[in-house]
Design a protein with these regions (language model features):
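Donor nucleotide-sugar binding/catalytic pocket of nucleotide-sugar-dependent glycosyltransferases
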Residues: 129-182
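A short helix/loop element that forms part of the nucleotide-sugar donor recognition site in Leloir-type
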Residues: 181-193, 379
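Nucleotide-activated donor-binding/catalytic signature segment of Leloir-type glycosyltransferases, i.e.
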Residues: 243-261
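Short alpha-helical donor nucleotide-sugar binding micro-motif in glycosyltransferases
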Residues: 260-261, 268-273
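Aromatic "clamp/platform" in nucleotide-sugar-dependent glycosyltransferases that forms part
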Residues: 281
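Conserved acidic donor-binding segment of nucleotide-sugar-dependent glycosyltransferases
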Residues: 313-314, 318-326, 334-339
């Protein structure tokens, strides 16, 4: 089977969606699937991340994501940023289909990551599978109905069928439990944090991730926990503003901005912490939470999107209301000042991640979806002949 994955930003940024598709591509290849990944680079720029783990083609097209993430929440820019995002995806998708159509060996399935137009713009009759990490803009609902299958997990798997008016296949994510394990190298000593109580977040620094809320919580927390320290792993257009916020809140010396860290190295950063925090406005089913669980950390997270799937029962973490820095600070304090409770929660998280989340199992479910859409399109072609 030949599968072509369209992952728009794989060469430009690494969030949960990009990480997931790399993991899928590796596992599918191990299961005997011939995988090609198509990603994009700017017309005049270069790739920011190497794409060398899987066979990949990088296509040049206008890249608007930096503009979108910087301005999407500013007053008066909403419509402009949505238009820019639409044009970005549309032009990349057209270029990808031209590449697919010209290939000497056609793809059996095209699997697009959150590229809503992928089925509408298809060349020929190749089946199209689209995975969705959250609620689509209303303008794309008719496009999504043209896909041969929609897949999702978390919040999206529960809510999208009503939005798009068709079934959505649930394909849960996985985690590399060998890489993300409690024992192994740590950055704590190198960062001079041996005697600190450390909170970590791993996120793109974009408005949706709301990392400013976590900085505000740490500003409140340091009055109650004298040696608290925050590690922020990730980069993005809000990095400078967040650094200024830490200065304004008087906690610049208690916050480390690590910038981008290769995904293969993030486990060592997780191991440097005592608790993981997520402060997003919305997160469908965040990879970073699952990776922190696998490392054996307790979780404190805003009760948004699909995060509840991981910590709803309270055994491995605590959910707090969104945009409430006092509640976030209080929940973090509970784990930072009670090592036994933190260890027990982390152990339960490690056990659950090991038992329930496997990239191999996730990839096998994908293959089942691919086989179904190939068979269904073949039946449709025979019926119309």
């Amino acid at each position: 089977m030949r599968v072509t994955m369209l992952v728009r930003c794989l060469a430009m940024m690494r969030g949960g969606g990009e990480t997931r598709h790399l993991a899928w591509a590796r596992e599918l290849t191990a299961l005997g699937v011939n995988v090609e990944v198509i990603s994009g680079v700017p017309l005049l720029g270069a790739a920011r991340y190497p794409v060398d783990e899987v066979p990949a083609t990088l296509l040049r097209s206008p890249y608007a994501r930096d503009f979108v993430y910087r301005f999407q929440n500013r007053r008066g820019f909403g419509r402009l940023t949505m238009t820019a995002l639409h044009v970005d995806e549309e032009l990349f998708c057209r270029a990808a289909w031209r590449h697919i159509a010209a290939a000497s060996q056609p793809a059996d399935v095209v699997h697009a990551h959150a590229i809503h137009q992928a089925a509408r713009l298809r060349a020929g009759d190749t089946p199209v599978v689209i995975n969705l990490p959250g609620p689509p803009n209303k303008r794309y609902v008719s496009d999504l109905r043209l896909a041969d299958a929609l897949i999702a997990d978390g919040w999206a798997a529960d809510h999208l069928p009503a939005v798009v008016g068709r079934p959505v296949e649930r394909v849960p994510k996985g985690v590399d439990i060998e890489r993300f394990r409690p024992d192994g190298p740590s950055q704590r000593d190198a960062l001079g944090l041996r005697d600190r109580r450390v909170v970590i977040t791993v996120a793109r620094l974009v408005p949706l991730k709301n990392v400013g809320l976590l900085i505000d919580a740490v500003a409140r927390l340091h009055e109650r926990v004298a040696n608290v320290h925050l590690l922020i792993v990730g980069d993005g257009p809000e990095a400078d503003a967040l650094q200024r916020r830490a200065v304004a809140r008087g906690v610049a010396d208690r916050v480390t901005f690590a910038g981008n860290v290769p995904h293969a190295d993030t486990a060592a950063w997780f191991r440097s912490a005592d608790v993981f925090a997520l402060s997003s406005h919305f997160d469908n089913s965040p990879n970073a939470v699952l990776e922190a669980m696998a490392v054996g950390l307790p979780i404190v997270a805003t009760d948004v999107g699909g995060v509840r799937e991981f910590v709803a029962d309270g055994s491995g973490g605590t959910l707090v209301p969104g945009d409430d820095p006092d509640a976030l600070a209080s929940a973090l304090k509970g784990y930072l000042t009670d090592a036994a409770t933190a260890r027990a929660a982390g152990a339960r998280n490690r056990d659950r991640a090991t038992r329930e989340y496997s990239w191999r199992r996730s990839a096998q479910q994908l293959i089942d979806v691919y086989h179904r859409v190939i068979a269904a399109r073949g039946r449709a072609a025979r019926a119309s002949a």
